[in-house]
Amino acid sequence: METRRSINERLASNLRFLRINTKVEEPLGKVKYMSQRHLAEFIGSHTQQISKFELGTNQLSASQVYRIAKLFGLPVDKLFDENLPKSVYTKTIKQNIYT
């Protein structure tokens, strides 16, 4: 049986991977990779919380996990998948989703 810690570590690893491989198109057309700030704004959190979660010192709420899955266009259970198809994932999101 998996421990809570191993599940949280997998979620943190997958989230970080998805975030750093997602591009955000800003209003003036500039495209850059998603920052912790972008992600925090979308899920209603703070940059420090995202940083702590990616480091494994904080946990996300169920509603935050749901919003993250929706943002990346994945079913919630895929965020916990140890076989997330990491070699093929790239996505560009328009910044206006944060408003």
What is each residue range found by the language model?
Residues I20, G44, L55-T57, Y66, ...:
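Residue-level detection of the helix-turn-helix DNA-binding "recognition helix"
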Residues V31, F42, T57-L60, L71:
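Helix-turn-helix/winged-helix DNA-binding modules
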Residues R16, R37, Y66:
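Residues within the helices of the helix-turn-helix
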Residues S61-K78:
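DNA major-groove recognition helix of helix-turn-helix/homeodomain DNA-binding modules
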Residues M1-K32:
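A short, Lys/Arg-rich alpha-helix, primarily the initiator
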Residues M1-S6, K70, F80-T99:
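Short, charged recognition helix plus adjacent turn
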Residues N14, Q49-K52, Q59, K78:
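Residue-level recognition of specific faces of alpha-helices
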Residues E25-K52:
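Short alpha-helical DNA-recognition segment
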